[in-house]
Amino acid sequence: MENRVNVRKANKKDSGKLLELIGYKAEFDRSMKGFNGEISTNKGKIERTLFGDVPFAHALLLEVDGKVLGFALFHYRYSSFRGEPSIWLDDLLVVGRHRSKGYGAELMHALKIEAGKSLASHISWTASPYNTKAHNFYKKLGAEVERMDGQRPYFRWAMYD
């Protein structure tokens, strides 16, 4: 039986689930030596900052057979010199045992659709230097390493040439 996969925009009712996913992302990042602090957000902050009158970021949720198994958290940027918007991907996560099943690609392709709607020239993000599996995944999508900060790669996925 094939799984039903859906990627949708998160809404205010998803704030608790987003908080849970952010916790999973922090655990994963700790394992990759990409984060060593404590999470200081909470459901109320997520509701105010993602779903208030002026959202500071947006989230896509990955659902498989109706169960949320991942998310992408992003915000828009604008270059005055280029006159172009772009997207900064803050977080991308597929929960533990559900990785390597193509779900990350589903999230990234949904994010690419969002980029197209906003006429974004590209999507950018960074990744832990130790997460080489993710580096390979991003390159397979067509993203390129735009620059390095020490050992940390910064990726750029162009939406058009």
Model-predicted segments: where are they?
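A short beta-loop-alpha structural element at the N-terminal edge
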Residues: N6-E20
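Conserved acetyl-CoA binding element of GNAT-fold acetyltransferases
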Residues: E84-G96
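Conserved active-site alpha-helix within GNAT-family acetyltransferase domains
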Residues: A105, P129-R147
